[in-house]
């Protein structure tokens, strides 16, 4: 009986490890990829995007992420959207927040981005009561 419990515990731990390593979004991933508060200062939006995309690992291993949005608000303003929400719920803010959209304009020899700032509503996907996915923005 004890051996059976140990076996199932090992299987469960393996499954959890695999799910964490292979694409299950986490709150920490969300913060790292999309949140920049207070906004890091650069002389232009393009300079901001070129540096931030590298800093946040979106240009690693010879690949350039084609598009990313950074949100410039306290993460708690987005966390409240996901309280008591089912996993994979999509929620949109009522308020507008300052964001920067970074769009790839050249990938060779190095990744280069244009940047545009907007005030937008933010739509997030929830898991475990926290935002884990930026699903988009709207005017």
Curated annotation (Swiss-Prot):
Organism equals Gallus gallus (Chicken)
Q: Which cellular component terms (GO) are annotated to the entry? A: cytoplasm; extracellular region
Biological process terms from the Gene Ontology for this record are: angiogenesis; defense response to Gram-negative bacterium; defense response to Gram-positive bacterium
The protein's name is Ribonuclease homolog
Looking up SUPFAM superfamilies in the UniProt record yields: RNase A-like (SSF54076)
- The record lists its disulfide bonds as 49-102, 64-111, 82-126
What InterPro entries does this protein map onto? Answer: RNaseA, RNaseA-like_dom_sf, RNaseA_AS, RNaseA_domain
Similarity section: Belongs to the pancreatic ribonuclease family.
Alphabetical keyword list = Disulfide bond, Endonuclease, Hydrolase, Nuclease, Secreted, Signal
- Might you give the EC number(s) for this enzyme? 3.1.27.-
The record's active-site residues are 34, 133
Q: What SMART domains would the database entry show?
A: RNAse_Pc
């Amino acid at each position: 009986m004890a051996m059976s419990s140990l076996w199932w515990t090992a299987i469960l731990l393996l499954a959890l490890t695999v799910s964490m390593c292979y694409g299950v979004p986490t709150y920490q991933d969300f913060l790292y990829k999309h949140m920049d508060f207070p906004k890091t200062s650069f002389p232009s939006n393009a300079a901001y995007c070129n540096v931030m995309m590298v800093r946040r690992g979106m240009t690693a291993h010879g690949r350039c992420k084609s598009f990313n949005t950074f949100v410039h608000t306290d993460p708690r303003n987005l966390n409240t959207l996901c309280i008591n929400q089912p996993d994979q719920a999509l929620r949109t803010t009522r308020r507008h927040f300052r964001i920067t959209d970074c769009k790839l304009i050249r990938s060779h020899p190095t990744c280069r981005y244009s940047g545009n700032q907007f005030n937008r509503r933010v739509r997030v996907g929830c898991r475990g009561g926290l935002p884990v996915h930026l699903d988009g923005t709207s005017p």
